[in-house]
A protein has these predicted regions:
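Extended amphipathic alpha-helical heptad-repeat regions
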Residues: 1-35
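Catalytic cores of secreted/periplasmic lytic hydrolases that degrade extracellular macromolecules
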Residues: 21, 25-90, 96-188
Length: 188
């Protein structure tokens, strides 16, 4: 399945505007992949809907983030899912990508793990008083502005739709999914 997903992903990235049948094939393959993971593990991640709760526990999230600087924030990702309804795995993977797994200067010095308010490398960003505050603020902002139909940046509830306003990079959603894949590999 990984090989099929990678092949479809490459085809999509090579096109300026994804062709419907390629995306449809990718979605079918990805659905089989997610079902396979769910069969062996109750943790859920749906890249087409970040409002679907993961059901991840704090200990599972710690295991998923093991070996990274984000491991101490595992309970915060779970809390954010319960409070704001944003999938904890998706939120953690955004933090993993945006902060280089918690090692970036912004993460360490500015408590900005999610790229919140950062629109260029020079941008100051919207920093928080603590690491936990940044994660909770981002979850609240995603829930309110990106994942609800009356939200200012709403284009849909999936990573690709969030990508439109969250990041200037058109490959952002794919990179976030790659982080998710790494997290699930840690869980097995």
């Amino acid at each position: 399945l990984d090989k099929e997903i990678n092949q479809c992903g490459r085809k999509l990235r090579n096109l300026k505007k994804p062709v419907h049948h390629i995306r449809s094939k990718y979605e079918k393959i990805h659905t089989r992949y997610v079902k396979g993971i769910r069969k062996h593990n109750p943790v859920i991640f749906n890249p087409y809907d970040l409002t679907v709760r993961s059901g991840v526990t704090k200990s599972q999230m710690r295991k998923m983030l093991e070996g990274s600087e984000l491991v101490t924030l595992a309970p915060v990702f779970v809390k954010a899912e319960h409070k704001y309804g944003v999938n904890a795995v998706g939120l953690a993977s955004i933090a993993a990508l945006e902060s280089a797994w918690g090692t970036s200067r912004r993460a360490r010095q500015d408590h900005n793990f999610t790229g919140f308010g950062v629109d260029s490398d020079d941008a100051q960003g919207i920093n928080a008083a603590s690491d936990q505050a940044n994660i909770m603020r981002t979850a609240k902002w995603l829930a309110k502005s990106y994942l609800t139909q009356d939200g200012i940046y709403y284009d849909g509830t999936g990573l690709m739709e969030i990508n439109h306003h969250y990041s200037a990079s058109f490959t952002w959603a794919w990179k976030v999914e790659h982080c998710v894949k790494q997290m699930f590999e840690n869980l097995q």
